[in-house]
Amino acid sequence: MQENNLPLTLVVDVLLAAAVNNTSIEHECSSLEGAPSANTIRGVLRSSLELQQLERQVNQALWAHLNPRHWKGLQKVAVDLVEVPYHGLAAKNLDEIRRGQAKQGTTHFHVFATVYVVRQHRRVTLALHYVRQGESLVSVLDALKSWLDELGIQVGLWLADRAFCSVAALRWFSKQPEAIVPMVARGSKASLSGSRGLFASKQSYWDKYTMHSETDGALTFDVAVVHRYSKPSRSAAKRLPPTTLVYAVVGKRLQRQRIRRSFASLVEAYRRRFGIESSYRQINQARLRTSSRSPELRLLAVAIALLLRNLWTLCRWMTLLGSSPGRPCGDSAFRFRTLLRWISRMVETRLALHTAIELSVPSPTKF
């Protein structure tokens, strides 16, 4: 990644500054005295980035800090789709943009699939995959699992987003050790047909459910209907009403083993997956902004945010470690925002921040 003898470290510094400050390459190049022009940076990226190669390099970078000895045995893994709203046309191929439910005034998105592991209070992103229009969920899952296989991660439990609640995806999960996927209420509200009838239950129980698809046929699987009461919140004036959660539970493990799992443990196992939602909020704090149509630059923006999130997880774990082995104790004052500020100050020290504006004509001292 070098053009016009431009050092790689200079390109990285500008990208990091744009990411940690939630700004664009254009803004950082105009704000830093030692930065080249934004067109130069974009030219280097345009000539250096290729989508498939970039995806592999990103995943290798995500793995770089992992110690294989700490990730032996079966892992609990969360899989999700990240939709970045897009208001524009595709750069080269129409399949770069994937359609979905309306969000932020558009139905067009750049979509990324991620695999995320939670172990001993460490939440780490292991792989990223660029999802194209028309790519099936099974193909997405195959791609993510191939990255995990290459890393040597063995998955004992898949925790998937409700977007994966389809016949094809559940059939894929049924060939894995075990998977928990929340179901979506479908059917008539009046007659409580379809899966909507499960959500109307006032008690917890196991049941069988058959899902139909015009393209993928029918699939019968176990469902856990969990009727639970929420714990009272300090801020809430009164106790929240009870809710009914419905999970599809599939996999190669025996049905008896699955039913032995208590409803509380099932909800707790899936609740840990919600760490991925807070991680995405933090990712948005560290994602550089761009109006470029380039899918490579869009992927790079998400990748930098994921790498920074992983770096913070590693640093925070180190600050929480005590003198004795085991899980860390207490809380840490080392916040994600703190890491972003440090990186911003580091780049400003290297490249010098513009602190004055040159005026072409004398300016009045009063309005």
Model-assigned labels for residue ranges:
Residues 1-59, 118-124, 156, 299:
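Short, positively charged, Gly/Tyr-enriched micro-motifs
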Residues 14, 28-29, 37, 41, ...:
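Short, conserved catalytic/metal-binding motifs centered on acidic residues
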Residues 38-119:
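Active-site-proximal, Lys/Arg-enriched surface segment
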Residues 48, 53-64, 345-367:
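Long, charge-rich low-complexity segments
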Residues 83, 203, 210, 214, ...:
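Short amphipathic alpha-helical "interface-anchor" segments enriched in bulky aromatics
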Residues 97-155, 239-250:
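Electropositive, glycine- and tryptophan-enriched low-complexity nucleic-acid-binding patches
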Residues 128-240, 324-336, 361-365:
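An internal, acidic/charged active-site-proximal segment
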Residues 289-346:
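Basic, amphipathic alpha-helical segments enriched in Lys/Arg and hydrophobic/aromatic residues
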